[in-house]
Each structure stands twice: as C-alpha cells, then as structure tokens.
Design a protein with these regions (language model features):
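A short, conserved, highly charged catalytic patch centered on acidic carboxylates
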Residues: 1-75, 82-115
Length: 115
C-alpha cells in the first residue's frame, strides 16, 4: 500500500502521518486521505488515493486543490497505485512544479519556508 511505500522506501515519518482527516471547506465536510505534518505538527503534504482503475485526471487535482484551500501545504501527491504525481506549489509564481517521482521526505524540508 502507498502509506507503507512512503514510510519504508521514501522515509516519511509514520508519527507525522494521519489518514482520513476531515477538513471543512465552504461549510461542507470533506475527507483528505492522508496528511503529512512537519515537525511543528503543521500540515505539509496532502495525499489523495484513487483505485487503480480510476485515472488521474484534472478532476482529481481539483479535489486535492480544494483541500489545499484550507490547509495551504507546499506539496501535493496523487496516486492510483499505478501512476503517481507529486508536485510542489510555488505560491509566489502561482504554479505547480512536478517532480519526476515521489521524492524522499528529507527533500521536502527545503520547501516548507517557501509557502
């Protein structure tokens, strides 16, 4: 599963990961699949999972972006188990910068202060 992959292979700290977190957006309760927190317990990465038969489309990115309106994280990850997308948000330039693969957690630390 994706959470185990992130912990075992990409060194995401399990103690800083929470699953199925409720976020209120426009007075509606939504559920983030996984949020990874920084060492100060602030949301840092949002992860959205889809089933393998569900293609990763703009609609999926719109979904995770809506969660980010509330959480304001620098990193977004979307996966259907077969295809993974990971991007950092450049808030100054108002754009997404995609990684070729999901980076090791240690790489993300440099982006925390860019929000």
């Amino acid at each position: 599963n994706m959470v185990e992959f992130l912990i075992q292979e990409k060194h995401y700290p399990s103690a800083l990961m929470s699953n199925e977190i409720t976020v209120e957006i426009n007075q509606m309760k939504k559920r983030c699949d996984t949020i990874v927190y920084d060492v100060n317990c602030q949301p840092f990465v949002i992860i959205e999972y889809k089933a393998p038969e569900v293609p990763i489309t703009q609609k999926v990115f719109d979904q995770i972006a809506s969660y980010n309106l509330k959480l304001n994280v620098p990193i977004l990850i979307v996966s259907n188990g077969l295809t993974h997308y990971c991007c950092r948000i450049d808030y100054a330039q108002r754009r997404y910068i995609f990684f070729k693969e999901i980076p090791d957690y240690s790489i993300f630390k440099q982006y925390k202060n860019e929000q």
